[in-house]
Amino acid sequence: MLKKNDIVEVEIVDLTHEGAGVAKVDGLVFFVENALPSEKILMRVLKVNKKIGFGKVEKYLVQSPHRNQDLDLAYLRSGIADLGHLSYPEQLKFKTKQVKDSLYKIAGIADVEVAETLGMEHPVKYRNKAQVPVRRVNGVLETGFFRKNSHNLMPLEDFFIQDPVIDQVVVALRDLLRRFDLKPYDEKEQSGLIRNLVVRRGHYSGQIMVVLVTTRPKVFRVDQLIEQVIKQFPEIVSVMQNINDQNTNAIFGKEWRTLYGQDYITDQMLGNDFQIAGLAFYQVNTEMAEKLYQTAIDFAELKKDDVVIDAYSGIGTIGLSVAKHVKEVYGVELIPEAVENSKKNAQLNNISNAHYVCDTAENAMKNWLKDGIQPTVILVDPPRKGLTESFIKASAQTGADRIAYISCNVATMARDIKLYQELGYELKKVQPVDLFPQTHHVETVALLSKLDVDKHISVEIELDEMDLTSAESKATYAQIKEYVWNKFELKVSTLYIAQIKKKCGIELREHYNKSKKDKQIIPQCTPEKEEAIMDALRHFKMI
């Protein structure tokens, strides 16, 4: 039985989702940092229990031909670049495999082609935002990054994947904090003033925002500090202060102050100008975010008469990018400042057909349904936890033709796609996009398309009355939905209405592009909703 500090020869057979090497010894699975498949190593046992263990490389006996020999190991130890030891082409293959595996293991999907991960031409120095802790190390104020799985600061000046100008601003601020003798935060003692430095830089504009995260409002000689850093970096247009006096791992507190200039920077995305506030979500890799959003737009095959819902809309980047190509855009975002940014960004780009609300995505979707808004396309870009079940059901109930799902967590995306399939949607396309080179993270765009009503014959249901038969012309689908809601407070989908119409012998216009699948799984209308729809059909004298 292996025990701590034993040294054993092993072969690495796989990588975990987070990029650790996997070795198998005596029926145990070991996870080893900085080890790649096909490598043979001498491994020192760090920790072991009944089924798994952790080890570290003592010596490489055989190295992988795909190893990046030039990586500074500090980037591995800190987690900044937890896949940086793997050559970039192999990183892309690894990410494609992660997407395929998650879709198969979680959603049971194996018959949809997953495209090769879309990579970056120069996969370093891309991050447009830095969040850097400030701590005391060996008696000196330092900036850097925490060692992986700890709060021990590793001093760093070059962050490898960040915009080099941002790195320079961080170093300049560090030196000024030392010069003005401002005390770094001490987590154990709950003392000190400066907790974090946050720096944003526009990829195209070059505008810079600096955020000082402090434990209390008063910062001694802060005006002089700001004056000095602006002398070095005149591109700074915003200096903000965030006050966080809580014993928490969260970076930001609730109170914000503008110390210099404006409370935002401006940058461009897909040809539009965007104001970006300190707290607003904005993709950290502008170059690849444009490719990500363009992929989602291309997947959705937008038309002039489309009505688009932009869920988790942030500051409006994707919704405003499509607004000029569609009839209407309705966006929802939970962060009030981001919603205000969205509205300002719409004005900034002379866009009048984009409408934004501050709410949860599921509440907004329900309210839009009540208001009779009938989307044809839904764009979702949720946080890592994915979509809620109530949102998925509400979005499916709209009967939208296409759902473009942008995901930063393929596991939750696969889970959500499984539910969408149960509600009558089919996964059509999947494209991974590498927004975070040198790390294990991957973004994915998936296209879901609404299945047709019949299990064996595709039937197209047109909401435009020009395409309705004479039997259907007495009421539109929207009118039937409104009637059912007003009388029964039940929400019914276009799919359910079509099923009951068909059951009643009302002719539906058949679509000549018949489905090639003989056994599609289609959700069926519940008895309660069937009776409500029947009542509506009788009301409109359709039966």
Swiss-Prot record:
Protein name: Uncharacterized RNA methyltransferase spr0932
Keywords, sorted A to Z: Methyltransferase, S-adenosyl-L-methionine, Transferase
Pfam families (alphabetical): TRAM, tRNA_U5-meth_tr
Tagged with keyword S-adenosyl-L-methionine: yes
InterPro entries: MeTrfase_TrmA_AS, MeTrfase_TrmA_CS, NA-bd_OB-fold, SAM-dependent_MTases_sf, TRAM_dom, U5_MeTrfase_fam
Superkingdom to which the source organism belongs: Bacteria
Active-site feature positions: C408 (nucleophile)
EC nos: 2.1.1.-
GO BP term (any one): rRNA base methylation
TRAM domain ranges (all copies): 1-59
Xref: SUPFAM superfamilies: Nucleic acid-binding proteins (SSF50249), S-adenosyl-L-methionine-dependent methyltransferases (SSF53335)
Amino-acid positions noted as binding S-adenosyl-L-methionine in the UniProt annotation, renumbered to this chain: Q283, Y312, E333, D381
Family listed: Belongs to the class I-like SAM-binding methyltransferase superfamily. RNA M5U methyltransferase family.
An MF annotation (GO) of this entry: rRNA (uridine-C5-)-methyltransferase activity
